[in-house]
């Protein structure tokens, strides 16, 4: 019988256990969107987690939508991340990075040149986002990408994946979830194109599959995973018929043999069943490693693995607040709660970032 704390073979790498740190935006990058010394410490503290998926990292300057999020499109960023991966590996850990294009989420005011964000269609998200000096503001109406521009965005993902390997990461996770660019192309609530990237399910999935094809060709399918969120409403994500859409996506991904599928089962931080969806039907369409996420407790995670529902279970806030998460889960010890006097995003010092306590030795 499988156990959450047993080693697991993920493509060419062996994980010490089946616990995964989900990608968690912290907005802690330094000048030039380069990871700094505190980021090195933050991830190294969590190296006992079977697999770390480092925070969403933009694939280009125009892919950014929030302050102080790291990139993987300059030599300085690659060098900064190399310090992180070297430190994690020195502690015996394994680390992927999530590659990200925010799409329509940033307001025009966020960009110094006033450039509109890009999206599949010129449909603003009914959501708010943070702009330094202004607080929470409405998302702007994006500009629809021209058909001829899309190949360039695909290439940005390919280049960032190569940069990730050069930075020492064990692999990458493509961010295909939560209303960002790839997810926005998938959904009829945000994609009303009339070219080969819109309309039918096959057309709306084309961009995602082109990104996955390019990235797997560049660095190998055994180093590429993808995250999907079929029914999460975050960032005004909407789709009239998600079941056939995501069944098609998973069938096509099966042909590309990614090293894992990372599925958010519901609305993160909210009800797990916020919309009806048959996740077991998806699972049956994919023969590879199945990773699950969405508020799993210790007991739920154990049951998911022992029952065969999942191969790996990712944790968000528990990994953020508990650098020794695996030990706490194994010993059924209490988990740290988020500090009440600090948020999850931003900051310049260790508080709320690298000062969460470990269990006593």
Regions found by a protein language model. Give the residues of each.
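Flavin-dependent oxidoreductase catalytic cores
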Residues: 1-361
């Amino acid at each position: 019988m499988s156990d959450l704390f047993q080693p697991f073979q993920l493509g060419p790498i062996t994980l010490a256990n089946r616990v995964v740190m989900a990608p968690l935006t912290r907005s802690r990058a330094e000048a030039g969107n380069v990871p700094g010394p505190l980021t090195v410490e933050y991830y190294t503290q969590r190296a006992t987690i079977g697999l770390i998926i480092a925070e969403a990292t933009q694939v280009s300057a125009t892919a950014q939508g929030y302050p102080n999020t790291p990139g993987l499109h300059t030599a300085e960023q690659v060098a900064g991340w190399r310090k992180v991966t070297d430190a994690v590996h020195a502690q015996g850990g394994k680390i992927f990075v999530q590659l990200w294009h925010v799409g329509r989420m940033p307001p025009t005011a966020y960009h110094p040149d006033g450039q509109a964000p890009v999206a599949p269609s010129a449909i603003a998200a009914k959501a708010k986002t943070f702009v330094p000096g202004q607080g929470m503001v409405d998302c702007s109406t994006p500009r629809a990408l021209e058909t001829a521009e899309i190949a360039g965005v695909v290439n940005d993902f390919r280049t960032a994946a190569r940069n990730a390997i050069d930075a020492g990461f064990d692999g990458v996770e493509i961010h295909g979830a939560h209303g960002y660019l790839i997810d926005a192309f998938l959904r009829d609530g945000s994609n009303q194109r009339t070219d080969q990237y819109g309309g039918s399910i096959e057309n709306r999935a084309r961009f995602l599959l082109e990104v996955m094809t390019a990235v797997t060709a560049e660095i190998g399918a055994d180093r590429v995973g993808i995250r999907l969120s079929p029914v999460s409403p975050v960032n005004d994500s909407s789709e009239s018929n998600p079941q056939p859409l995501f069944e098609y996506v998973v069938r096509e991904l099966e042909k590309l043999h990614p090293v894992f599928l990372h599925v958010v089962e519901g609305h993160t931080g909210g009800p797990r069943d916020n919309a009806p969806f048959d996740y077991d039907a998806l699972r049956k369409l994919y023969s590879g490693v199945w990773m699950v996420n969405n508020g799993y407790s210790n007991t739920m995670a154990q049951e998911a693995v022992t029952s065969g529902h999942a191969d790996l279970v990712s944790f968000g806030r528990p990994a953020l607040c508990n650098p020794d998460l695996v030990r706490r889960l194994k010993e059924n010890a209490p988990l740290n709660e988020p500090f009440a006097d600090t948020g999850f995003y931003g900051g310049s010092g260790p508080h709320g970032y690298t000062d969460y306590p470990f269990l006593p030795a």
